[in-house]
Every structure is written in C-alpha cells, then in structure tokens.
Design a protein with these regions (language model features):
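Metal-dependent phosphoesterase core characteristic of DEDDh/y 3'-5' exonuclease domains
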Residues: 1-132
Length: 132
C-alpha cells in the first residue's frame, strides 16, 4: 500500500528531522513510484482464477468485496491456504517480492504511482463476472 507507506515515511521524516523536512526531495521528483497492491489488483487479482479462489475460500470483506491484501495474495500464488502474514518488516517484504514477481510475469500493462482504493478494481471485476 504505497499510499500508506508514503504517509508513514513523511510522518517519520518530520518526527526525526523536524516539520517541513521532506522524505523525497526535489532531486528525486522524476522517480517512478509503483504500488505493489495496485499492480496486483490490476494484473493478478482481476483474473478469473483469483475470483474463483476467493469465492471458493470465502475470502471476502464484511461488505462482500474480495480481500486483496498481501496475505490473501500470497495464499493465492503459493497455494498455502494456512499462510498468515507476519506483519514484520523483512518477512512482509519477502512475500511482497514474490507477489511483485508474479505480477511482472503476467506481462500486462498497469498504472504507475498510487491508485486510490485499488481493491475496487477487483470488486468491479468480481461484480461484472457474477452478472454474466
């Protein structure tokens, strides 16, 4: 979730170095940012096999939307249905790298940067599939 990470980095930078200090200064303005969650929702989780997976194992939010977090994504790509995300830096990065690699392997176009509510891409796809 790049949006969350960028907020956390801005807050941490300000707490460490004072108000007005920036995490990414203007010299880095041309860096292309990518949100793994958005990328996964666009190219991996918007596939019939993912929709079948979440339906089969009832991996939905309370409001009936498909779960699209890293834990569910890793369960999907690894087949490890018992997997629970550690929520510890390195362990989380390791599974997110595997999700990212799987996304790149799809060789599909995707948006760069931060997409608002990437889960809604999958929810829309899921709804459209159910209406067919």
């Amino acid at each position: 979730n790049l949006n969350f990470d960028m907020r956390a980095l801005r807050t941490t930078t300000e707490k460490l170095y004072g108000k007005g200090k920036r995490f990414l200064t203007s010299e880095y303005k041309d860096i292309e940012l990518m949100c793994i969650w958005s990328f996964a929702c666009e190219v991996l989780y918007s596939r019939p096999s993912f929709i079948n997976f979440i339906d089969k194992y009832n991996l939905m939010t309370e409001k009936g939307n498909p779960l699209t977090n890293a834990e569910v994504g890793y369960r999907y790509i690894s087949g490890d249905l018992e997997f629970e995300e550690a929520h510890r830096g390195l362990q989380d990065v390791e599974i997110e790298c595997q999700i990212l690699a799987k996304c790149f392997a799809q060789k599909k176009k995707h948006e760069s940067g931060i997409l608002g509510n990437p889960w809604s891409i999958v929810a829309k796809y899921n709804k459209e599939k159910k209406e067919i």
